[in-house]
């Protein structure tokens, strides 16, 4: 069953907490996610923005993107430019890594941007932002950002997707640390992705 068909009853209030648990959600997650997502979400809106620094793009990011594509026809992966911070990989390298990771996915576009994410959404006419969370600390942080974005742009909603358990240990910072120490990346990066050499 697609993610869309599984989560629509959750948004509509038709799915009990016991049923949600059978789909892999804890009771606490069920309540938090239901409150976060119910908003003004319109499932008929077919395009979403998936923003991040993606330095680099990981198997966890790919998991979130793949699941988002079961909800939306198109997801724009937006690589954020932080002028005050030197990235581990250049912008073009990050875009290339994402292109490799998503080569078999339909409906994915990759762009880079600077400035506010909600301003990019307005520019592109996108009404939904997709974010992935690995734990409740991530969730609380994303909820705070989502609430701030709603003040700036009330018509733009954030869709928070919990990372599948097998990817919950993965982060870009962990990948960077492994790269710096020549560690094993097989559980962190899709095996068909070739990362650029670090000079």
Please identify what each model-predicted range represents.
Residues 3-6, 10-15, 19-20, 24-31:
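A cross-taxon signal for low-complexity, glycine/charged-rich
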